[in-house]
């Protein structure tokens, strides 16, 4: 009799355990969207972002770095050998995933010191760790200019908020093309 009660209690215990709801926020939906950027050179603050207008979502990385130039002036300012590495945190260097109640204009939302007021963030996840690597690949060189492809990659990043945590070992934010005068 005791064995039967024990088995019933054990079955009820396992049946009552729950892993909770599985929430999957696809971070790879941004792969076809254009990488955009802006900066405030006086404050040494920079933002790279992609926006999925179909779902009103954005993924952005903002950081402060006194040595980084969003538009390098010379070829000497670009290294194809070593990427620029920025350590993410919860305050100054962040990867942000946001969902909005309406579509947004990236320049208006990310590039103004005061964001537009008629847009509400319905979900926000903020990085708690990880790194951002900004790497350059030589595309073409002429007598007057050099063209690079710049890739923004997050490594070992965790973004969290509202009881949700998402971890990615590798997440490519996007690429853009920059031209530097020789």
Language-model features: locations:
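Sec-dependent bacterial lipoprotein signal peptides
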Residues: 1-17
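Bacterial Sec-dependent N-terminal signal peptides
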Residues: 14-45
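Short, hydrophobic/proline-enriched secondary-structure or compact coil segments at domain edges
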Residues: 43-54
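Surface-exposed helix/loop patches within compact recognition domains
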Residues: 52-144
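Short beta-strand segments
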Residues: 57-61, 150, 167-171
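Flexible beta-edge/linker motif
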Residues: 146-148
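Edge beta-strand at a domain terminus
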Residues: 153-182
């Amino acid at each position: 009799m005791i064995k039967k009660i024990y088995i019933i209690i054990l079955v009820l215990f396992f049946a009552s355990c729950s892993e909770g709801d599985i929430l999957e926020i696809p971070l790879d939906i941004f792969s076809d969207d254009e990488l955009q950027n802006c900066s405030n050179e006086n404050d040494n603050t920079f933002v790279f972002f992609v926006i999925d207008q179909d779902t009103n979502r954005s993924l952005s990385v903002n950081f402060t770095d006194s040595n980084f130039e969003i538009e390098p002036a010379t070829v000497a300012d670009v290294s194809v050998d070593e990427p620029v590495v920025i350590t993410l945190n919860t305050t100054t260097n962040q990867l942000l995933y946001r969902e909005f109640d309406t579509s947004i204009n990236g320049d208006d939302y990310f590039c103004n010191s005061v964001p537009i007021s008629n847009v509400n963030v319905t979900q926000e996840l903020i990085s708690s760790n990880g790194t951002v690597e900004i790497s350059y690949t030589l595309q073409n060189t002429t007598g007057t200019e050099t063209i690079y492809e710049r890739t923004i990659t997050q490594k070992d990043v965790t973004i969290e908020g509202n009881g949700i945590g998402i971890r990615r070992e590798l997440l490519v934010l996007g690429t853009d093309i920059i031209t530097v005068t020789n």
